[in-house]
From Swiss-Prot:
Record protein name field: Leucine--tRNA ligase
Primary localization: cytoplasm
Location in or out of the cell: Cytoplasm
Record has Protein transport as a keyword: no
UniProt xrefs under CDD domains: Anticodon_Ia_Leu_BEm, LeuRS_core
Locus of motif 'HIGH' region: 41-52
Keyword Metal-binding appears in the UniProt entry: no
Organism: Streptococcus agalactiae serotype Ia (strain ATCC 27591 / A909 / CDC SS700)
Motif ('KMSKS' region): 610-614
Pfam families (UniProt xref): Anticodon_1, tRNA-synt_1, tRNA-synt_1_2, tRNA-synt_1g
Length: 833
């Protein structure tokens, strides 16, 4: 039986594409452009897993589709190669992270090429290449010049096991590090910060201009966390001290019965009484060991200590106790809150625990039983009584401003971006600290500041990076004899990935980040595909850098990525026992269609779960390509279900996709191809062209493949295949199965040219409509016959056909026809007696 020999055909076409630079980016300025971007991978030692090709196949199908539609297509690939994993591996094994990274990249590239992706490899970027990070450093110097990069002594998330501080976004909800799952503690350190807060409003507003999943926009909105409210100043009793709180509900000020400061608040030591000093000091120590996420966990028990001090509520002159509690963060708002326990759940729980007053100021609910958090008219609030929420807020803000004890205020949850890492394997920060106390950026003419090669990459132990040990590199002297020290912190992995999509546009430019005209030609990115796990970190950081570059006149657009698509996760086959615990696949046996634990004999249920080494359910694409072929993997991953759904891997599904490709191969290579069109496939062919064109454009790849299957089924029923339809069909399937597409194109045309730039097939609208139609014939209102007739017959023609039908004739034999009602394209009704 004829079948698709992937082991012969796929390497042949991969070599053809490479030798002929088939996918070199088009530069014809008269053509429309299409920029299809994948989130470039971190080249890990494990290589590609089957989750990577899902997104890559989607952008590849779009790229091949747009090339055929006459677009210049930019479809590049590169490597996000700095970062902790390579450094950890190097420390564990004694290998050089640069060598390890280069080996991993070579392996990733081999795997990617085996899958037939149409990348323009002339544009490959690598974040660890000095010719690349020269421009990462250049962007940093511009941030520094604009005052957007600054040094500060800040409490950081310190991970002892990693020897570095990490950003808030890299701390998991359980208070451990995203990388490695290590404990995170808070400690003050000198750090580089990027002033992303200066762009908070624009980062929020411009989300309206991009075509992104609403869920991702919401995650960014929540992370930026805009609140409109008021600052209120509280004086501390019997002192000259005061503190400010930010509240979104200034209208509830009459219900404020206590205040809470963050343990790190600058005022705490100054106002704490002698009686409370010991308890306060111990509480502060314990709070310093917890991450922000652990401290603000809503489910945890409320803890706190009274400072011994009282504040004066400005609106009614009442004395309220001042506490410290770790759920208030110094880094958020003003680091102090006014507590209104009657109308806030967290404040209510705290007040109940420490027996503090609860005074309702909104009508409704029973505040002895629970906080009332809905809206109601104001009570116990003097000049606000009887007002609704909006009116009361406006009136209270007016009162605060008139009395000089507060003002309207907009705040953001977003914090400045902690940008330094105390590690070796990252971009050196191009700053020199001079002994006269000044700091300067390394001039552009001296960039890149190259990361020095060293065998000793262990953290220094002092909180500085290993670069602090390299005296020759570290110490510099100015022309005037002033000595200086280079910055020893390096940039985080997020730096290189915040602008890589710009370098693809002009990757070999030695004079600038990229040529302005080329940036104008290609920006914004038309489609960006990657995992939803990057919703806040990478996507927010890249948008921030892009806006800075826009302000500098470097890029012509406000936003980098016009459309974003998050592919779903490919889940592995796994098994669950009666307790809900997952069982590794090597501990499972199949008997009579059921699954059992090898050791306990317990029957297990199949439950798809994230692929992991521990469950032994990771599928390596190399194995799939070897057994089934790259085209099978591509078609299967696109046919599994909607691209954004999470779906379980299935060997049966893979085999089904392989069988489909064999049927396609047989159809084109064994069916008689003819120049004569019988018309039998007119409708299904034109429907297929229309459906595949529309569905590829909408990224509904599974339904496009289903339509291709419909065509194959229909074509197999015919003795011959019209050559134009055979060619058109091969063009339609080529983006999904490009090796097969190229091979079958040669079978049909023997052109010696790639199918890649052959104009995409068009469809004939008139052929989409059936030329024949079924009508019913009724006698006395009951259906007696069904006729297939040409469309749009006249009443007379319909009537004649109906009366000539044998079934109808036998029904009306011997009866008088009173009248015949014929409705074109619908029915004929015969009235007899």
């Amino acid at each position: 039986m004829t079948f698709y020999n992937h082991k012969e055909i796929e390497p042949k076409w991969q070599a053809f594409w490479a030798d002929n630079h088939t996918f070199k980016t088009g530069t014809d300025a008269s053509k429309p452009k299409f920029y299809a971007l994948d989130m470039f991978p971190y080249p890990s030692g494990a290589g590609l897993h089957v989750g990577h090709p899902e997104g890559y196949t989607a952008t590849d199908i779009l790229s091949r589709f747009k090339r055929a539609q006459g677009h210049n297509v930019l479809h590049p690939m590169g490597w996000d190669a700095f970062g902790l994993p390579a450094e950890q591996y190097a420390m564990d094994t004694g290998n050089d992270p640069a060598e390890f990274t280069a080996e991993n990249i070579a392996n990733f590239k081999r795997q990617i090429n085996a899958l037939g992706f149409s990348y323009d490899w002339d544009r490959e970027v690598n974040t660890t290449d000095p010719n690349y990070y020269k421009w990462t450093q250049w962007i940093f110097t511009k941030l520094y010049e604009k005052g957007l990069a600054y040094e500060a002594e800040v409490p950081v998330n310190w991970v002892e096991e990693l020897g570095t501080a990490i950003a808030n976004e890299e701390v998991l909800p359980d208070g451990t590090s995203e990388r490695g799952g290590y404990p995170v503690v808070r400690k003050p350190m000198r750090q580089w910060m990027l002033k992303i807060t200066a762009y908070a409003e624009r980062l929020l507003e411009d989300l309206e201009e991009v075509d992104w999943p609403e869920s991702i926009k919401d995650m960014q909105r929540n992370w930026i966390g805009k609140s409109t409210g008021a600052n209120v100043t509280f004086k501390v009793k019997d002192t000259d001290k005061d503190f400010t709180v930010f509240t979104t509900r200034p209208d509830t000020l009459f219900g404020a019965t206590y205040a809470v400061l963050a343990p790190e608040h600058a005022l705490v030591d100054a106002i704490t009484t002698a009686d409370q000093a010991e308890a306060v000091a111990e509480y502060k120590r314990q709070a310093s060991l917890k991450s922000d996420l652990a401290r603000t966990d809503l489910a945890k028990e409320k803890t706190g200590v009274w400072t011994g001090a009282y504040a004066i509520n400005p609106v009614n002159g009442k004395e309220i106790p001042v506490w410290i509690a770790d759920y208030v963060l110094a880094s958020y708002g003003t680091g102090a809150i006014m507590a209104v326990p009657a109308h806030d759940e967290r404040d209510w729980e705290f007040a109940k625990q420490f027996k503090l007053d609860i005074i309702p100021v909104l009508e409704g609910g029973n505040v002895e039983e629970a906080a009332f958090t809905e809206d109601g008219l104001h009570i116990n609030s003097d000049f606000l009584d009887g007002l609704d929420k909006a009116s009361a807020i406006a009136k209270m803000v007016e009162w605060l401003e008139a009395e000089g004890v507060g003002n309207e205020k907009v705040t953001y949850r977003l914090r400045d971006w902690l940008f330094s890492r105390q590690r070796y394997w990252g971009e050196p920060i191009p700053i020199i600290h001079w002994e006269d106390g000044t700091s300067t950026a390394v001039p552009e003419s001296e960039l890149p500041l190259v990361l020095p090669v060293t065998k000793d990459i262990r953290p220094s132990g002092t909180g500085e990076s290993p670069l602090a040990n390299l005296t020759d590199w570290l110490e510099v002297t100015r022309e005037d004899g002033v000595k200086g020290r280079r910055e020893t912190n390096t940039m985080p992995q997020w730096a290189g990935s915040s602008w890589y999509y710009l370098r693809y546009i002009d990757p070999h430019n030695t004079e600038k980040l990229a040529d302005e005209e080329l940036l104008k030609q290609w920006l914004p990115v038309d489609i960006y595909v990657g995992g939803a796990e990057h919703a806040v970190l990478h996507l927010l950081y890249a948008r921030f850098w892009h806006k800075v570059l826009y302000d500098l006149g470097v890029v012509p657009t406000k936003e980098p990525f016009q459309k974003l698509f998050n592919q779903g996760m490919i889940l592995g086959t796994s098994y669950r026992d009666s307790r809900g615990a997952l069982v590794a696949t090597d501990k499972v046996e199949k008997r009579d269609g059921s699954f059992f634990h090898v050791e306990t004999g317990e029957e297990l249920e199949q439950a798809p779960a994230k692929m992991s080494k521990s469950l032994k359910n990771v599928v390596n694409p190399d194995d799939v390509v070897e057994q089934y072929g790259a085209d099978t993997l591509r078609v299967y991953e696109m046919f599994m279900g909607p691209l954004d759904a999470s779906i379980a891997w299935s060997e049966e599904g893979l085999e089904g996709s392989r069988k489909f490709l064999d049927r396609v191969y047989r159809l084109i290579t064994t069916k008689e191809i003819t120049k004569e069109n019988s018309g039998a496939l007119d409708k299904v062919y034109n429907e297929t062209v229309k459906a595949v064109t529309e569905q590829v454009d909408q990224m509904k790849f599974n339904t496009a493949i289903a339509q291709l299957m419909v065509f194959v089924n229909a074509a197999n029923k015919e003795d011959k295949l019209f050559s134009d339809y055979a060619k058109g069909f091969v063009q339609l399937i080529a983006p999904f199965a490009p090796h097969l597409g190229e091979e079958l194109w040669q079978v049909l045309t023997a052109s010696g040219e790639s199918i890649s730039y052959v104009p995409w097939p068009s469809y004939d609208e008139s052929k989409l409509v059936e030329n024949e139609i079924e009508i019913v014939v009724q006698i006395k209102g009951k259906v007696k016959a069904k006729l297939v007739v040409a469309k749009d017959l006249s009443r007379e023609e319909l009537q004649d056909l109906a009366l000539a039908n044998e079934k109808v004739q036998s029904e009306i034999a011997g009866k008088d026809i009173i009248k015949v009602i014929a409705v074109p394209n619908k029915l004929v009704n015969i009235v007899v007696k």
